[in-house]
A protein has these predicted regions:
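Transmembrane signal-anchor hairpin modules in multi-pass inner-membrane enzymes, especially those
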Residues: 1-28, 42, 52-58, 62, ...
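Transmembrane alpha-helix segments characteristic
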Residues: 5-20, 65, 69, 130-140, ...
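Hydrophobic transmembrane alpha-helices and their immediate junctions
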Residues: 163, 281-324
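Long extracytoplasmic/lumenal interhelical loops at the membrane interface
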Residues: 85, 214-228, 236, 240-281, ...
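A membrane-periplasm/extracellular boundary helix in multi-pass inner-membrane enzymes
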Residues: 144, 165-214, 228-236, 244
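Membrane-embedded alpha-helical segments of multi-pass membrane proteins
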Residues: 1, 34-46, 101-110, 152-159, ...
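Membrane-interface helix caps and helix-loop-helix hairpins in membrane proteins
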Residues: 25-33, 141-148, 330
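Alpha-helical transmembrane segments of multi-pass inner-membrane proteins
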Residues: 56-87, 97-167, 186-191, 298-301, ...
Length: 330
């Protein structure tokens, strides 16, 4: 059944890549526009190879912990070079890529690290300390990135995990998980350099400003207007969408007619993967995107339920959090 899941996942990946390639061809885009579909196509032989020659699951968590620690090291390095910006909350560690993507990947590595908690190990206390270091490193790196949207995925994953623990009556892990999450949030809120309380207050203010006065020249206001704009485009062409070039042309017309704020001129993505796909590739693209989320989730979920060995169960749980996380990242 898991081999079937690999094949179905690979098929959905290939369809998504072809969908992007077709969009790029229709839009007349070349060069860097091919980066995303090519990356997806490159993963296909990797998936088949790993299905035939899977590594020891322990290296999955070692890699996640080291990756999370590396992300934190980069975030601290970038912060230490700009302490003046850190003090006023103006710095977002980006890992030399993009602050949002960097923060989301760090968050995912933190979650995968914690998934290995129940994996059997001869030195249990040392093993769990190692995983906690990875979890804390990923969380702190995400906080230093200033990315807020990705934390929705953490809420979803924590909620699903708590639900599973309640249904299986595993109260000790449930109490431990809720305690770790609560202490992490409370601890992060007390660190002034992270400016969490200020960010929450600012987000509330920007939402109210958009709802009451239509202000879209802020981070939250721009997102809300982009979402409305993308949803409107989807309703106009629900089957196949507008393509990337069509989306940009419609946005240009909306800017000229003052239907959207000029602040939106610099964005070519509505900051929501579902709405981006819906507006540019329609319902067909949406079905392919949902397949990307659902097929791997189903494959890992079925094996997770059936698995008896703690290490196998932990490995499948690590696989489960990946589609959940990317759905939450949006």
């Amino acid at each position: 059944r898991f081999q079937s899941g690999i094949k179905n996942t690979s098929s959905s990946f290939a369809l998504l890549a072809l969908c992007w390639l077709l969009d790029n061809w229709i839009s007349g885009e070349r060069g860097s526009a091919l980066e995303k579909p090519i990356k997806i196509l490159i993963t296909l032989p990797c998936l088949f190879y790993l299905a035939q020659r899977p590594p020891q699951s322990r290296w999955l968590w070692h890699g996640a912990v080291v990756g999370a620690m590396g992300a934190l090291a980069i975030a601290i390095f970038q912060a230490s070079n700009h302490m003046d910006l850190v003090r006023i909350g103006g710095l977002r560690a980006n890992g030399f890529t993009n602050a949002i993507q960097f923060g989301n990947i760090a968050l995912l590595l933190a979650t995968i690290s914690l998934c290995g908690w129940n994996a059997a190990h001869s030195r249990e206390n040392l093993w769990r300390l190692w995983l906690i270091i990875g979890f804390a490193s990923g969380i702190l790196a995400s906080l230093l990135s200033g990315s807020r949207g990705g934390w929705l995925s953490l809420v979803i994953m924590a909620g699903l995990t708590c639900l599973y623990l309640i249904l299986t009556r595993r109260w000790r892990p449930f109490i431990l998980l809720t305690s770790i999450c609560s202490l992490t949030v409370i601890g992060a809120a007390q660190v002034p350099q992270l400016h969490l309380q200020e960010r929450i207050a600012l987000a509330q203010h920007e939402v109210q400003a958009y709802q009451q006065r239509g202000e879209a020249n802020t981070s939250i206001g721009a997102r809300l207007q982009m979402w409305e704009f993308a949803w409107q485009l989807y309703k106009e062409k629900p089957l196949l969408g507008w393509t990337q070039s069509g989306y940009m042309e419609q946005k240009r017309e909306a800017l000229e007619e003052n239907r959207v704020d000029p602040f939106l001129n610099e964005f070519n993505h509505p900051h929501n993967e579902l709405l981006d796909t819906a507006s540019k590739r329609g319902s067909v693209g949406l079905m392919i995107l949902f397949a990307i989320y659902f097929i791997p989730f189903r494959a890992f979920w079925s094996r997770f339920i059936e698995a008896k060995h703690p290490e196998a169960k932990a490995a499948y749980l690590s696989g489960l959090v990946i589609p959940i996380a990317y759905f939450g990242f949006g």
